[in-house]
């Protein structure tokens, strides 16, 4: 059985787990478990020799479990193999802990991960020439995928536009005050699709 593991010091690695035959082993190596591992490093496919469960985050609900599948797909698509990234590891771990405890909406859980993940891979949502002081709370803004947010000037730009007050809440990291998280998430979805050459993020459509 081949597993993809996100590690703190080596990034995303592929390991071959020989001898994983029992139901207990399969259960132990389910997604979203923090493991202590030993492995023999190989160029392409390392050999897993030992694992120990440190935390199984068993309080994660089924809905958030599906959200984790989406996060896994993003990491698999956009994080290169064997490229160390402690920030990505910490983001993922912190979010798994968060999902095991929170009563937030599923959109909020997605949104928090997405904006931080985009920042970590170098594609943070940008403002073009706008700044917080120049944003009119009563106007609408659309996202130009080449330069960032711009003020809406015509009807075409109204599609997937953001109210000025929501944009300011986003910039001030007051995410719980944003009324239209879904439109922000459509923008983020489009960014991911552009980064993947138009390929769909399959698990996005689970919700």
Protein language model regions, located:
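Non-catalytic alpha-helical scaffolds and adjoining flexible linkers that form interface surfaces
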Residues: 1, 6-207
């Amino acid at each position: 059985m081949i597993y993809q593991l996100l590690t703190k010091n080596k990034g995303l690695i592929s390991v071959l787990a020989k001898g994983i035959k029992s139901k207990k082993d399969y259960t132990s190596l389910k997604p979203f478990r923090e493991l202590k591992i030993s492995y023999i490093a190989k160029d392409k496919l390392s050999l897993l020799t030992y694992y120990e469960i440190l935390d199984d985050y068993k309080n994660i609900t089924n809905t958030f479990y599906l959200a984790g599948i989406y996060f896994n797909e993003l990491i698999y698509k956009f994080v290169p193999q064997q490229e160390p990234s402690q920030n990505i590891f910490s983001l993922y771990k912190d979010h798994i802990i968060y999902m095991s405890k929170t009563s937030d909406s599923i959109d909020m859980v997605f949104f928090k991960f997405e904006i931080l993940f985009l920042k970590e891979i170098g594609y943070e949502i940008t403002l073009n020439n706008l700044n917080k002081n120049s944003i009119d709370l009563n106007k609408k803004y659309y996202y130009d995928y080449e330069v960032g947010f711009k003020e809406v000037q015509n009807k075409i730009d109204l599609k997937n536009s953001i109210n000025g007050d929501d944009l300011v809440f986003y910039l001030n990291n007051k995410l719980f005050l944003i009324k239209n998280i879904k439109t922000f998430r459509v923008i983020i979805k489009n960014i991911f699709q552009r980064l993947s050459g138009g390929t769909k993020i399959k698990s996005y459509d689970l919700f």
